[in-house]
Amino acid sequence: MNSKIEIIKIKAKKPINPTKIPGAKYVINQYIGCQYACKYCYARFMCKWYNYGKWGSWVVVKENLPDLIKNKHIKGKIYMSSVSDAYRPIEKDFKLTRNILKNIDKRAELSILTKSDLVLRDMDLFKKFSSIEVGLTINNFEGNLKKDIEPFSPSNEKRIDALKTLYENGIKNYAFISPIIPDLIDVEYIIGETKPFTNFYYFEFLNLKASREFKHYLEQNYPESYEIISNKTAFKRYIDEVINTIKKKDIAIKGICVH
C-alpha cells in the first residue's frame, strides 16, 4: 500500500453523473484519484481538474455521498467507479462504498469493478440487490513488471481468488482483462485460470492515449512491446489476432474495448 497519500475531503453536489460508458447510464465516483498508481491508467486525465500532484499521490473523498444517495431509486445501470477504485485501501477506514451500498435503493442496477479483494467484505450487501454484477480487473503482471506499473494494487492471485469466492456465493461476477499489451499479457492463460468460476468477460486493449509516461516506460524496458503498439498496422494485427483467439473460447463475452 502507498502510505504517502494526500487525502482531500469534499462535499459532493450530486451522487451520480451521466456516462458514455457502454451499457451504463450513470457513474458513481465516491473517490477520485487512486492509491494504486498504475502507470497505464486512463483516469490520469482527472489531474486536469484536480491538481493535487502526481497521479497516485492523492485521493479525493466525497464524504457526503452516502447521504446524497440514500433511498434514491435510480433507473438505469450504474457503474462504480469510472475514475477510481471503490475498494482502494482507504475504503477500510472511510467505508464510503459500504455505506453507499447500504443506503441506495436495492432496485438499482449496479455494476462494480475493482482490483481489490476487499470487495468480499460487502458480499452480504450484494445479495440484497435485485440486479448486481461485480468484476475484478485481471492481468498477469507479476514480479518487477507489476512492481513497476501496478506498484500498490493487490496481487492477481488475490483478485482471482476473490472472483472465485464471489461465484461460489452466488454473486454474478466478471473478469475484466486489462490492459492487454503485446508480450506482457497472456489472455489465453488468464481465461484458463478463471473460466470455471467466471460468469462473463470484458477485454480491454491498452489505451495509447492514457499515459506518455507508460509509453516511454515500454520503450525503455520492453522495446518489442513498444514496437508493436507504436506501429498502427502492427498493433491492429495484434488486436485482431487476440480477438480471433478469444472468440474461439467457450466463454460469455460482454465487451471488447479497443481505443
UniProtKB/Swiss-Prot annotation:
Coiled coil: none annotated. InterPro entries: MJ0683-like, rSAM. It comes from the Archaea. Transmembrane segments: none annotated. GO terms for molecular function: 4 iron, 4 sulfur cluster binding; catalytic activity; metal ion binding. The keyword Lipid metabolism does not apply. [4Fe-4S] cluster binds at residues 34, 38, 41. Keywords: 4Fe-4S, Iron, Iron-sulfur, Metal-binding, S-adenosyl-L-methionine. Binds 1 [4Fe-4S] cluster. The cluster is coordinated with 3 cysteines and an exchangeable S-adenosyl-L-methionine. This is Uncharacterized protein MJ0683. Residues 19-249 form the Radical SAM core domain. It comes from Methanocaldococcus jannaschii (strain ATCC 43067 / DSM 2661 / JAL-1 / JCM 10045 / NBRC 100440) (Methanococcus jannaschii). Its cofactor is [4Fe-4S] cluster.
